[in-house]
Amino acid sequence: MRTVDVIVAGTGGMGTAAAAHLARRGAGVLALDRFPPGHARGSSHGQTRLIRLAYFEHPDYVPLLRRARGLWRGLEQDTGSRLLVECGLLASGPAAGDVIAGTLRSAAAHALAVERMTAREAMGRWPAFRIPDAWESVFEREAGYLAVEACVRAHAEVAGRRGAVIEADHDVRGWRVEGNGVVVETSRETVSAGRLVLCPGPWAADLVRLPAVPFTVLRKSLFWYAPAAGLAPAAAAALPAFAFDTPRGFWYGFPMLDGRGLKIAEHTGGRVAADPLDVDRAIDPAEQAAVEGWLADHLPGVGRTRTDHAVCLYTMSPDHHFVVGLHPEHPQVALAAGFSGHGFKFASVIGEILADLALDGTTRLPAGFLAPGRFAEHVAGRDP
């Protein structure tokens, strides 16, 4: 039986980041997954992910985001990769809605630079958008996007360079605590380690073993469309990223990159995926109609020429906040799961937190609000 310092189960966005941070600290790391890093069967693919500091979900995330940004920039320098692009983010919606009110709350709490504007002012700056007069818009200049597959590859590169072993074709079937360590069963072998880091993505329900935390996997569609005659390609490429809080759901998208078209997706909604390995990846006509309806309402210069489509998976926690910390019953096990469709931007700092927890049993980073014990404790009045 192979024995290592730390086993990382999962090599998506979080697992490769954890492997990189652990290897940097000198740990002997074995990272295992069914698929190789950068695969398109989980939650870490699809060209881009938003990154923003004025975080409407909760102000407590902002210190982690600041650290994450610095780590992404450091990873760029370490690998010579272009990972984080600051194209700005335009958020629009009702002033009292979760997106605008939450964005402004985080900006005020952490003295973040954002620009408030009326719908007319926003459309004056970016004429491609159509925004109802009653809405408010907030522009965050330093927001932008991460090149998601490149980020995963960069962390895997750093991990390998520092001595970590990353292996695919391992279906991680279970784990057990033995003495002060952990034994992991895969489809190929049994491996032991002093510590286990769980980054299972949509397989969280099978591997995390937290009865108080029911995870739900949602199938989400991503669409790319070419600009039409009313929107020149150069103008489409110069748009900011965008997030619209509409009566028909919360939608987001990106400027046109590499001639592929503009990426648009609905953050809300989605169908439950009972088996992450058996997901319908065909285009759903109802989803396509919804996307094209959103485009007609808010970005009419984008035509109806679909250039690409992909499906990714959200792993939802009960409160839609991350589940990151030591396992409540097994301190040999650190875990990161339930990112609920808004986690990738944090991968760099989540990897650091997981390395701290695995090697030190604690972390100086302010991540206690994400600990799995919050579900068992039923603490009232705390959000999250």
Question: What spans do the regions from the language model cover?
Answer:
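N-terminal Rossmann-fold NAD(P) dinucleotide-binding loop
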Residues: 15-16
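Short beta-strand to alpha-helix junction loop
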Residues: 63, 91-99, 138-157, 279-287
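Glycine-rich FAD pyrophosphate-binding loop
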Residues: 23-44
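Active-site substrate-recognition segment that forms the wall
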Residues: 20-24, 80-84, 190, 195, ...
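Dinucleotide-binding Rossmann-like beta1-alpha1 core, especially the glycine-rich loop
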Residues: 48-125, 134-135, 250
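C-terminal catalytic lobe of FAD-dependent flavoproteins
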Residues: 291-384
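Helical element adjacent to the flavin cofactor pocket in flavoenzyme catalytic cores
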Residues: 139-195, 199
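Beta1/beta-strand and adjacent pyrophosphate-binding region of the FAD-binding site
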Residues: 1-12, 30
